[in-house]
Amino acid sequence: MANTINTNEEFENILKDNKFLVVMFWADWSKPSTQMRDVFDQLAKQATNQANNKLLFLKVEAEKVHQISGRYNVKSVPTCIFLNQGKLVQSVVGANPSELALQTNNFSKTCDTLPLEEQQQQQQSEEIINKIKLDQEQEKKLLNERLEKLVNQSPVMLFMKGNPEKPQCGFSNKTVTILKENGFEFGSFDILQDQAVRNGLKEYSNWPTYPQLYINGKLVGGYDIIKDLNEEGELIDLKP
């Protein structure tokens, strides 16, 4: 398991005695952080089991120990950094387990590990990377299947912030108003309640913002497009 750092003083003391550090910055409100912490602990355990291991894995709650976050210009979580004598040599930003495993393997090669140890560690890292990739592919497949069902849940589906009775953003509120004024019956999904859907739907439909309107499973667009269609009298023609 990786060591948890609670104060800047703890970090400074460790920095004096350890040349090679892998540090993960996380936050308890960040779901991607939870996923990456599990991978980070797995990589730390693997390194600990290696003879002549010189890597030390540390976990830092970014907002709690902000001195360290600021020192290495950490602006989002999860972020993992690789330090050689306190100097930043590499970083992995976001929930990217395969990239973290790859960079950890590459970083370990700079730590004077014996050739046999390198081979064993590389093999184990590759196995971890392959497993992570398979898990990611399966997870993405399941998410896309879920998204396809959601966009077809109703002939007209609005993915929005909040719900039609209580929209949580101005654009969602305006979109609901336009649909109601045109007599649309529609289902809705509150993307604030599901981070996986919120992030996944952007990639699924290649549309970066919300709200998103779907008719018969096909993306119509966001508020600007809905507004233009309404003003041109074309929105009503899309009603199923």
From Swiss-Prot:
What coarse category fits the chief subcellular location reported for this protein? cytoplasm
Query: Which CDD domains does the UniProt entry name for this protein?
Result: GRX_PICOT_like, TRX_PICOT
Gene Ontology cellular component list: cytosol; nucleus
- Signal peptide range: none
GO MF term set: iron-sulfur cluster binding; metal ion binding
What's this chain's function? Crucial regulator of cellular iron homeostasis. May play a role in regulating the function of the thioredoxin system. Does not possess any thyoredoxin activity since it lacks the conserved motif that is essential for catalytic activity.
Provide the domain comment: The thioredoxin domain lacks the two redox-active cysteines. This strongly suggests that it lacks thioredoxin activity.
Q: What is this protein called?
A: Glutaredoxin-3 homolog
Record the organism.
Dictyostelium discoideum
Q: Which gene encodes it?
A: glrx3
